[in-house]
Each structure stands twice: as structure tokens, then as C-alpha cells.
């Protein structure tokens, strides 16, 4: 478990690599999987524009290199954001490229599966929590606990937004078939026909950077649990867990196949 907001390993490596170029490559490969990626970001930010005051505080949950934070703070000049993640490589990239965005962005190195992550945020309450393409990694028991914690952290009237591949349940096999078929077609077009760099090749290429050996060793240690078999929580579980966590309005505000933005108002 990290014991400081930015790891010592990350701090010493931010100038050794062209992180801006790697972030551009990251965005390109992510868009290969999700052609509607920017539309999904915009839909999430539209919600904040309608529901929140200008000077709100947001949590970028499982932030990676800070894609949400970057877009949110660019659109809302009076907002602040706390970006939290466990991946030392992506945190390093985000900090190197984005910095603190004029003192409005703070990075936190913490493990969402450990209960003490909330105490490391430095915020007693927030106006909004947002996450994209991340929480599907969590086993149901961790996801339900995190939603309970968010139910305490997000102020009444605040909002949680999760943009992710939220699967249809087993009672909807035709829906599952359509969504899976279209996803496979999207991937074939992006990575075979157009030859875009995919997730695995992006990571392999970055790992070949000689100066990042220690950083990747730390990453491997932190994510050893990912080698185990996992089952991504289906959409219905997310809804039930948010309701049990104290959110009063829950529904899909944007969707393309299984790619949805689940919105929950506290």
C-alpha cells in the first residue's frame, strides 16, 4: 500500500521519457476501443455543468493518466479535482504532462481496495465523483464497498458518474449478442484494418523504455492480483450497489451499446 501521495519512484522519472508523446499514443489506442470516447466525456461534463455550481470539487476515481481531470479542469476554470489511482506508471505520465493544472489538480497514490483510501484524499466531502473504463476491474465485494464510501463522501445533491462497459445481464442474451458482436467489429476495424496500436502493444512499447525498469517492477508488484480470474460486475449490480450506498436517483444518462454513463445523484 503506498504511503505517500506520489511515489518516490515516480518522482525521479518524470523527465527521462517523452511523456506527452506517450499520452497522445494512449489517447489514440483508447479511442480505438471506444470511438465514442470524447462524446462520453462530454456527456459526463454536461451533467456537471447542469447540476453543480462553478466552483465545485470533483474526484477522478481510478484516474489513470488523468483524462477526466484534464478535460474537466479545462472546461470548468473554477473547479478543483483530486485524481486517485494505484498505477505508478499512469500516475507518473499524468503528473509529468498535466502537472497540477494551475494548482487545481492534486494527485493521490492510493489503492481503492484498501479502506483507508478515502482518508488520503484530503477532502471531507466532494461535489462529484467520476470514473471511466476502470471500475470493471473491481470484484463485486470491493465495488459495493466503494459505492458505500462514495455515498458518504459525495455531498447531498452531488453526483457520481461512471462511464464504462457495463454489461447486460444474463436475462438479456440477445442484447449481449448484439453488444458483443458490435464490439468485435469495432476492434477489428481499429486494430486490424486500420492498424492502430492496441492496449497490449502500447504497454509493451512503453516498458521497453530503459529508464522505466524500476517503475514497471513496482507496477507488477501492485497489480499481481490482476492475474487471477475475475468477473466484471454487470450493470444491475452497479445500480443495486449505488442504491444501497445511499444514492437516490440512479439511471443511464448516455449510452452506446454496453458503453454507458451511469449517473447517480446523492
PLM regions: where:
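Conserved class I S-adenosyl-L-methionine
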Residues: 2-52, 67-71, 161-195
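Class I SAM-dependent methyltransferase SAM/SAH-binding core
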Residues: 59, 69-115
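Class I SAM-dependent methyltransferase "Motif I" SAM/SAH-binding loop
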Residues: 62-66
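A conserved beta-strand element that flanks and buttresses the S-adenosyl-L-methionine
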Residues: 130
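A short glycine-rich, Lys/Arg-flanked "PGG" loop and its adjoining helix->strand segment in the class I
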Residues: 144-156
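Short alpha-helix
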Residues: 230-245
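Core SAM-dependent methyltransferase catalytic element
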Residues: 245-266
Amino acid at each position: 500500500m503506498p504511503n505517500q501521495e506520489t511515489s518516490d519512484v515516480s518522482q525521479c522519472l518524470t523527465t527521462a521519457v517523452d511523456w506527452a508523446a506517450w499520452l497522445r499514443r494512449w489517447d489514440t489506442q483508447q479511442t480505438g476501443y471506444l470511438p465514442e470516447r470524447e462524446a462520453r466525456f462530454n456527456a459526463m461534463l454536461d451533467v456537471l455543468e447542469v447540476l453543480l455550481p462553478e466552483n465545485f470539487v470533483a474526484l477522478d476515481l481510478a484516474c489513470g493518466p488523468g483524462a477526466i481531470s484534464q478535460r474537466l479542469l479545462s472546461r470548468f476554470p473554477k473547479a478543483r479535482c483530486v485524481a486517485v489511482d494505484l498505477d505508478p506508471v499512469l500516475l507518473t505520465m499524468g503528473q509529468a504532462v498535466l502537472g497540477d493544472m494551475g494548482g487545481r489538480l492534486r494527485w493521490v497514490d492510493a489503492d481503492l481496495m484498501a479502506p483507508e483510501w478515502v482518508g488520503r484524499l484530503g477532502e471531507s466531502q466532494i461535489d462529484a465523483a467520476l470514473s471511466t473504463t476502470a471500475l470493471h476491474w473491481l470484484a463485486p465485494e470491493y465495488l459495493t464497498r466503494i459505492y458505500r464510501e462514495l455515498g458518504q463522501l459525495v455531498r447531498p445533491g452531488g453526483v457520481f458518474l461512471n462511464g464504462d462497459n457495463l454489461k447486460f445481464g444474463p436475462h438479456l442474451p440477445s442484447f449481449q449478442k448484439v453488444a458483443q458482436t458490435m464490439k468485435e467489429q469495432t476492434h477489428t476495424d481499429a486494430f486490424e484494418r486500420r492498424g492502430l496500436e492496441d492496449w497490449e502493444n502500447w504497454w509493451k512499447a512503453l516498458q521497453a523504455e530503459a529508464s522505466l525498469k524500476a517503475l514497471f517492477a513496482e507496477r507488477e508488484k501492485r497489480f499481481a492480483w490482476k492475474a487471477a480470474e475475475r468477473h466484471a460486475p454487470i450493470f444491475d449490480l452497479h445500480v443495486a450497489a449505488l442504491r444501497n450506498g445511499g444514492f437516490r436517483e440512479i439511471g443511464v444518462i448516455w449510452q452506446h451499446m454496453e458503453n454507458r454513463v451511469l449517473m447517480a445523484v446523492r
